[in-house]
Design a protein with these regions (language model features):
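Specific aromatic-rich, kink-prone transmembrane helix
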Residues: 71-91, 107-111, 128-129, 341
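Membrane-interface alpha helices of multi-pass inner-membrane proteins
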Residues: 102-118, 130, 155-160
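Multi-pass, polyprenyl lipid-linked donor-dependent membrane glycosyltransferases
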Residues: 14-17, 51-83, 114-124, 325, ...
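Transmembrane-helix signature of polytopic, membrane-embedded enzymes
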Residues: 29-55, 73-74, 96-98
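Membrane-proximal stem/loop segments at transmembrane-domain junctions that anchor or position
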Residues: 165-255
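Membrane-interfacial entry segments at the cytosolic side of transmembrane helices
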Residues: 42-44, 96-104, 138-155
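Transmembrane-helix motifs of polytopic, lipid-linked glycan transferases
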Residues: 16-40, 78, 82
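Membrane-interface anchor segments at the N-terminal boundary of transmembrane helices
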Residues: 9-22, 237-308, 312-313
Length: 347
């Protein structure tokens, strides 16, 4: 159900802050990418396409809505810009200094703030930590990089705090209740599986207690034990996951400017899951070039690209199965990550 957007005077300062942060975030990311591409034409493309990506309705509409999406997108753009700098600094083996300390502090601050805008972001941080450990094993020369050691250590702390916070807050309870009501309890075989894991009758007094203590773990075991269901449920809905590129909750007056922005939005935010396939092909091509040319800059791009694909995929899968309502909204950050990757790596 859509509602016409209207200005709420008591929230204007919050919306103003969200818009200012968004402008800064996407501008910073554009400059960071432009600084890491070689040709003048490519730099020009970066400072045009990336801000346009962030200022078209798929992203910009959320800046005028009170929700976690605006901060999630903006802090993600800032975090990505800083991680890009960290990756290239590590790849070039630059020595530590005052600039490195500042970069480390800014990166950790941005990642910390971004992590706690949405629970699913925690998994991207966990994957980033794993990638850091793998990098220490593969590239011995970065093991003495104090900045990377500090970042990796803090990433582990953020992951632990984030997971603990998500579980203790019980924010998962309502979404998982929706999942059980729609995907588990109406099907006798699935309900029987849960009973085998100790689930009492849903009408029993013990059920709320069991659900509170065991539901996430039991549901995860169900998905792992039924890979066919898990795979087909996810892949059959990919089209729907990628189908939205404008927030569906509020509508705006269809002025000429709005229609032009929507047309540009459809180009920059294609609503097809083929974007995922194109991203994979781009990263594979870069990986081949990095391997054959032994180029440290290409290696940094590949590292960042693989982390983005892994993180976006994990977040999309988790958010897809974590609720039965508002799936496109829950998976939006992952979808927009794939769309952004297309332009960044094409440049």
């Amino acid at each position: 159900l859509e509602t016409e957007r209207a200005v709420q005077p008591c929230f204007t300062r919050i919306v103003l802050f969200q818009n200012l942060l968004s402008v800064i975030a996407w501008s910073v990311l554009a400059l960071a990418v432009a600084n890491r591409v070689a040709g003048g034409f490519e730099k020009l493309l970066a400072v045009i396409i990336i801000p346009a990506f962030g200022f078209t309705p798929a992203i910009a509409d959320w800046d005028s809505i009170l929700g976690s999406e605006s901060l999630t997108f903006s802090l993600f753009a800032i975090s990505l810009a800083l991680l890009l700098k960290v990756c290239f600094k590590a790849a070039s083996d630059e020595s530590d200094g005052s600039n490195s300390i500042l970069l480390t502090g800014l990166t950790l601050t941005a990642l910390f703030l971004w992590t706690f805008t949405r629970d699913s972001n925690i998994y991207a941080i966990a994957i980033l930590f794993v990638f850091a450990l793998i990098s220490f094993a593969i590239f011995p020369r970065i093991r003495k990089n104090k900045g990377l050691i500090i970042i990796s250590t803090v990433l582990l702390v953020i992951t632990i705090l984030g997971l603990q916070s998500a579980m203790e807050s019980r924010r998962w309870k309502k979404p998982l209740t929706n999942v059980f009501a729609e995907y588990i309890l109406p099907f006798p075989a699935r309900e029987e599986f849960m009973v085998g894991l100790g689930m009492p009758d849903t009408k029993a007094a013990e059920y709320p207690v069991w659900f509170k203590e065991n539901a996430p773990r039991a549901y995860a075991r169900f998905l792992i034990a039924h890979p066919g269901y898990t795979f087909t449920s996810f892949t059959s809905n990919l089209g729907g996951i990628f189908s939205e590129n404008i927030q569906p909750y509020f509508y705006s007056e269809q002025t000429t400017v709005r229609k032009t922005l929507v047309a540009l939005n459809d180009i920059l935010h294609p609503n097809t899951y083929l974007v995922f396939v194109l991203d994979l092909l781009l990263i594979l091509g870069l990986a081949f070039s990095a391997f054959t040319r032994k180029n440290s800059d290409l290696t940094a791009w590949v590292w960042l690209g693989v982390w983005l694909i892994a993180s976006a995929t994990i977040m999309m899968v988790i958010n897809f199965f974590a609720d039965s309502i508002g799936v496109t909204r829950h998976t939006m950050l992952a979808v927009e990550t794939f769309r952004l990757m297309l332009w960044v790596f094409l440049i």
